[in-house]
Amino acid sequence: MSSGVQPTQECLEKFQELKTGKKLTYVIYGLSEDKRSIVVLKASEDKDFDSFVAELPEKDCRWAVYDFEFTLPGGEGVRNKLCFIVWSPDDASVKNKMIFASSKEAIRRRLDGIHTEIQATDFSEITKDALFEKATRK
């Protein structure tokens, strides 16, 4: 069931900037204060994965796209995959979790070029190893 919430034009523009410009490393999305639209909360060039994870709140939901760069074993080179992350921490309110769950597809379907998706409820589920496993799965 859809909540009727839609992403702003800035959401789509920042995603395109991440996807094509390769300057941004991640974009974090959330709901506007009136909960009527999806907005960009942060877009960053910081390549430090731990800094990205630190931007996710302990008690509030978010969506994010992270440009995950990794090295394949056996000398196969460096790859990049766009990962869509659904952050719905256990400590978020039930109402917030419901709004985010019902609004996810509104943003996800507008972000063409996502390779993989991770849904996480705890920081232990958002690790480089988890992203690597998803990004290299065939």
From Swiss-Prot:
Cited Pfam families: Cofilin_ADF (PF00241)
ADF-H domain ranges (all copies): 2-136
Localization: Cytoplasm; Cytoplasm, Cytoskeleton; Nucleus matrix
Top-level lineage group: Eukaryota
Keywords, in A-Z order: Actin-binding, Cell cycle, Cell division, Cytoplasm, Cytoskeleton, Nucleus
A GO BP entry: actin filament depolymerization
MF GO annotations: actin filament binding
SMART domains: ADF
SUPFAM superfamilies on file: Actin depolymerizing proteins
GO cellular component, one term: cytoplasm
Family: Belongs to the actin-binding proteins ADF family.
Full protein name: Cofilin
Organism of this sequence: Cryptococcus neoformans var. neoformans serotype D (strain JEC21 / ATCC MYA-565) (Filobasidiella neoformans)
